[in-house]
């Protein structure tokens, strides 16, 4: 898809959203008159539409939706709850594309990877994760970036900045907000996330902070199999910390997990000044066989 066609597709979605919001603000569009219940119903419909539209637009907009789902100061609660579904709704890309990216990034080093599972453990807006074994016997996961993401991201982020400028000039939606600043910050963060070498450095630093705490396990980086678009980490299975039933069934005390998690965050903030900013439950699994660990 050319840059112009991509921009037109994005603007079509933006203008449709603006038209829907304008329509919903008009009392005469509600049969029998507007009331709180009808307005809330419309909001849920629009939030559902927006979530589906962001999924159709792809990675950069899925990531934007995920960021907005953590901003109740910008969007109503109903919108935030609907957008939160983007955390788990991203479709995977094909295994052949996974293999192509690995070959492009790792070259002959791919020979070290055996038993690469074609089914991803999970898929996200930027990448998906596959379990594998190395020739050494080490169990790992490979985070593989979606193909063609760099060019697409830059196109999308350029349009996002244009949209932000339009929103800022709106008499209602621009009041009390700095949309261009949010677009610039979004651009800075997302472009940095495209380089998995940065994430690898952060992961290694984060692991170093907790080497003296045997209650907390953080996967090590396999540097020789990591690159700009591939990140190789030790495989550490676990249970989502918000899956209370599964924790109890495994003999793990959820309260103990919560206490360890809270203590680790205090240590990150107060002692190290370097902390993990993603509180998604899937990011913080509890090991399935160690009731005192997280």
Model regions and ranges:
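Residues on conserved beta-strands of the protein kinase catalytic domain
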Residues: 126, 138, 228-229
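ATP-dependent phospho-/nucleotidyl transfer catalytic cores
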Residues: 77, 84-91, 103, 150-155, ...
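Short acidic/polar mixed-charge low-complexity motifs
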Residues: 136-138, 291
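Hydrophobic residue at the +6 position relative to the catalytic HRD Asp in the kinase catalytic loop
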Residues: 282-286
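N-terminal accessory/targeting segments that precede structured cores
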Residues: 1-128, 151-179
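Glycine-rich ATP phosphate-binding loop
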Residues: 131, 138-146
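Conserved beta3 strand of the Hanks-type protein kinase catalytic N-lobe
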Residues: 132-133, 279
């Amino acid at each position: 898809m050319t840059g112009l066609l991509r921009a037109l597709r994005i603007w079509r979605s933006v203008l449709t959203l603006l038209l829907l919001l304008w329509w919903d603000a008009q009392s005469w569009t509600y049969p029998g008159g507007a009331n709180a219940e009808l307005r809330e119903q419309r909001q849920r419909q629009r939030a559902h539409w927006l979530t589906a539209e962001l999924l159709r637009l792809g990675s950069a907009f899925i990531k934007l939706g995920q960021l907005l789902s953590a901003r109740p100061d910008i969007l109503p609660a109903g919108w935030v709850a609907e957008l939160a579904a983007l955390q788990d709704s991203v479709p995977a890309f094909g295994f052949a594309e996974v293999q192509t990216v690995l070959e492009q990034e790792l070259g002959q080093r791919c020979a070290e990877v055996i038993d690469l599972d074609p089914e991803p453990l999970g898929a996200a807006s930027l990448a998906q994760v596959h379990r594998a074994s190395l020739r050494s016997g080490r169990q790992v996961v490979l985070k593989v970036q979606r193909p063609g993401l760099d060019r697409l991201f830059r196109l999308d982020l350029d349009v996002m900045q244009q949209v932000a400028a339009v929103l800022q000039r709106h008499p209602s939606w621009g009041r009390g907000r700095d949309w261009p600043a949010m677009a610039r910050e979004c651009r800075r963060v997302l472009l940095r996330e495209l380089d998995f070498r940065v994430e690898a450095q952060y992961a290694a630093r984060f692991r170093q902070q907790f080497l003296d705490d045997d209650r907390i396990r953080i996967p090590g980086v396999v540097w020789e199999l990591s690159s700009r678009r591939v990140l190789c980490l030790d495989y550490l299975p676990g249970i989502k910390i918000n899956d209370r039933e599964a924790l109890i069934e495994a003999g793990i005390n959820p309260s103990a997990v919560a206490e360890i998690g809270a203590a680790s965050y205090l240590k990150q903030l107060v002692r190290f000044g370097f902390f993990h900013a993603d509180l998604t439950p899937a990011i913080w699994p509890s090991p399935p066989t160690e009731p005192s660990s997280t």
